[in-house]
UniProtKB/Swiss-Prot annotation:
It comes from Levilactobacillus brevis (strain ATCC 367 / BCRC 12310 / CIP 105137 / JCM 1170 / LMG 11437 / NCIMB 947 / NCTC 947) (Lactobacillus brevis). This is NH(3)-dependent NAD(+) synthetase. It holds the Pfam family NAD_synthase. One of its GO terms (cellular component) is cytoplasm. It is an enzyme of class 6 (ligase). Deamido-NAD(+) binds at residues 141, 174, 181, 261-262. The gene is nadE. ATP binds at residues 47-54, 161, 190, 212.
């Protein structure tokens, strides 16, 4: 195994194999313990895209609050699934299929288009035009503003969908979908998450569809793998300690180095990671 590969695996806590049922239990218990530790928190708030990661995380959230209601008799424990479309989203049917399957306690819908467009317009009147890529990051951050507004109104925690295959590549928006309170699937790679969804009986389409962040107007539904230049199969193999091609390993390690700032708090004078 490559030295850098071992370092990354240790940092992201990825196991070479998992028992899906055990990891489901671990994630649910983690969510329950967090809510019970902070007795002012009663809700879990999660944005639902209709992809694998939010579907899995939503199922874990719903199971956690259902068990808490049963065990404590406190019916204030709730899971709020949030749809956050930019206007009309092409994956709306998938998102609603996921929400229906997870049987969320509540569903809220916030159209981020007016706020996003207003922000873009306000910035552009005072400076240079905002690129389509930059606008995509604004969309991601507007979605988190909405989720935190809901969580603040409902004594809630915002739940993240970040996992090891995203963490290693930094494939999320800084202070966008990377800005959450709790990440129950953080240690898992992509195929391990799919195995957990299969264990939970989720519709195959939701975890076999092509993953996409779908943030760019100019390149709608751009596959993650096209944006990253490496397959999730190779990322998962790498994180599980298997051999991958030199090209794939170098690509993964390059992403890991370039996106180190996303896995840290804001840089201060004592930090050295950015110099490595």
């Amino acid at each position: 195994m490559r030295a850098k590969q071992r370092e990354i695996i240790d940092a992201l806590k990825v196991k070479p194999t998992i028992d899906p049922a055990t990891e489901i239990r671990r994630s649910v218990d983690f969510l329950k313990a967090y809510l019970q530790r902070y007795d002012f928190m009663k809700t879990l708030v999660l944005g639902i895209s209709g992809g694998q990661d939010s579907t899995l995380t939503g199922l874990l959230c719903e199971q956690a609050v259902t068990e808490l209601r049963q065990e404590t008799g406190d019916n204030d424990y709730r899971f709020i699934a949030v749809r956050l479309p930019y206007g009309e989203q092409a994956d709306e049917d998938d998102a609603m299929m996921a929400i229906d399957f997870m049987d969320a306690d509540e569903v809220q819908r916030v159209n981020i288009k007016p706020a996003t467009d207003a922000m873009i317009q306000a910035v552009e009147t005072s400076g240079k035009p905002i690129s389509d890529f930059n606008k995509g990051n604004v969309k991601a951050r507007q979605r988190m503003i909405a989720q935190y507004a809901i969580a603040g109104a409902r004594s809630g925690a915002v739940v993240g969908t970040d996992h090891a295959a995203e963490a290693v590549t930094g494939f999320y928006t800084k202070y966008g979908d990377g800005a959450t309170d709790i990440c129950p699937i953080w240690r898992l790679d992509k195929r391990q998450g799919a195995a957990m969804l299969a264990q939970l009986g989720a519709p195959e389409h939701l975890y076999k569809k092509v993953p996409t962040a779908d943030l760019e107007d100019d390149r709608p539904a751009l596959p993650d793998e096209a944006a990253l230049g490496v397959r999730y199969e190779d990322i998962d193999d790498y994180l599980e300690g298997r051999s991958v091609s030199e090209a794939a390993a170098s690509r993964i390690e390059d992403w890991y180095a370039k996106t180190a700032h996303k896995r840290h708090l804001p840089v201060n004078v004592y930090d050295t990671f950015w110099q490595e």
